[in-house]
Amino acid sequence: MQIEKIDFYGMSAIHFEAGGYEAIMIPEIGANVVKLSHKASGTNILRTPAEDEIETFKGRPQVFGLPLLFPPNRIEDGTYSFENRTYKYPITIPAQNNYHHGIIKSQPFIITRTETGNDYVEIE
């Protein structure tokens, strides 16, 4: 199991391996695993952007990879609280007064912790 920083077409990326699979995530683009492959067979599981598709990927990251969707589903009234902190989001479904998920698929983030085990990788 390993986690390492790599260059992915000029962008800083994280390459990680566990359980016979390898993956790439680009934190500056968002929480989207842009590559997932089975190492032994060489099978690519996700649509990974090629170098000439990077601008398309930046504009429409949902077309490639596997976006991590947080928070799931909808947030009633666009507000929730966690650990004594209240988070407010814009209402994106006015008819239901809800905010819809998908907020981190294209938001840059900073990795604060990594961990590897015999058959897993954790990235926060």
Language-model features: where?
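Surface-exposed acidic/polar loop and edge beta-strand patches at domain peripheries
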Residues: 1-124
